[in-house]
């Protein structure tokens, strides 16, 4: 799967786009990291790429199709997303939450078949949350909840996975483990995983490509550039 962006502008009003003139191509089989200051538009871009927000201008293609040509169900089979907001659900077990990731493939009543349950089991194992399987979502810590929502995205089995600061609530060892798992998944399962992050050192270590939002633009940057930025911050 390929995401192709041409002359793309994203935001809330055409007169004041958050990011404009985006020209970029991202291919499956890679972990791409989106970096930049708080409030600069990373979440807005991710929401546009998944169809939550309409594009303001330009072209946004998934494969060879414009994103606006997909039905909601079709799009849910192409792109999954994990946002930073807490899920507005309670009284569901972790296994049930992750099972909701199968909804694009289940029938009207949403019953999971044997093959769906295998996918759910695989997502739970991949994120290392077997011990949480029977817990209720409202009993989890922020970090545990984030792992569950990533597992739900994995269970959705989309070629494109978008993650908005997926390691924000994790301790450092868990952050590194999550980055490593996502990189391995992108490579071994031929997925395009795009995540926003402030963990620059981990982004440099694990990302196949680095994208920086700065002053209303999106540009590919090198690991050397990011390391220089880290040094500049430390030396202030």
Region roles according to the model:
Residues 136-140:
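Conserved ABC ATPase signature
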Residues 50:
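Helix-to-loop junction immediately C-terminal to a conserved catalytic motif
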Residues 1-5, 9-21, 89:
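A short, flexible loop at the N-terminus of ABC-type nucleotide-binding domains that lies
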Residues 161-164:
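Catalytic Walker B motif of ABC-type/P-loop ATPase nucleotide-binding domains
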Residues 197-198:
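H-loop/switch region of ABC-family ATPase nucleotide-binding domains
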Residues 58-66, 75:
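Conserved ABC transporter NBD signature motif
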Residues 35-37:
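The feature captures the beta-strand-to-loop junction immediately N-terminal to the Walker
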């Amino acid at each position: 799967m390929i995401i192709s962006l041409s002359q793309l502008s994203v935001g809330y009003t055409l007169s004041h786009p958050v990011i404009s003139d985006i020209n970029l191509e991202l291919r499956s089989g890679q972990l791409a990291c989106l970096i930049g200051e708080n409030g600069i538009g990373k979440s807005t871009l991710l929401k546009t790429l998944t169809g939550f927000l309409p594009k303001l201008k330009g072209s946004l293609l998934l494969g060879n199709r414009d994103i606006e040509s997909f039905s909601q169900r079709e799009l849910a089979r192409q792109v999954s997303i994990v946002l930073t907001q807490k899920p507005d659900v309670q009284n569901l077990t972790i296994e049930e939450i992750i099972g909701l990731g199968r909804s694009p493939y289940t029938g009207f009543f949403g019953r999971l078949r044997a093959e769906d349950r295998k996918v759910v089991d695989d997502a739970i194992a991949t994120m290392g949350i077997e011990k949480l399987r029977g817990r209720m979502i409202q009993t989890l810590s922020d970090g545990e909840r984030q792992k569950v929502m990533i597992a739900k995205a994995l269970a959705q089995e989309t070629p494109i996975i978008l993650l908005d600061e997926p390691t924000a609530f994790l301790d450092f060892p868990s952050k590194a483990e999550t980055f490593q798992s996502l990189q391995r998944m992108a490579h071994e399962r031929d997925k395009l995983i795009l995540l926003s992050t402030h963990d620059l050192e981990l982004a440099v270590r694990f990302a196949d490509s680095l994208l920086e939002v700065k002053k209303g633009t999106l540009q590919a940057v090198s690991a050397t550039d990011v390391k220089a930025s880290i040094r500049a911050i430390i030396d202030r």
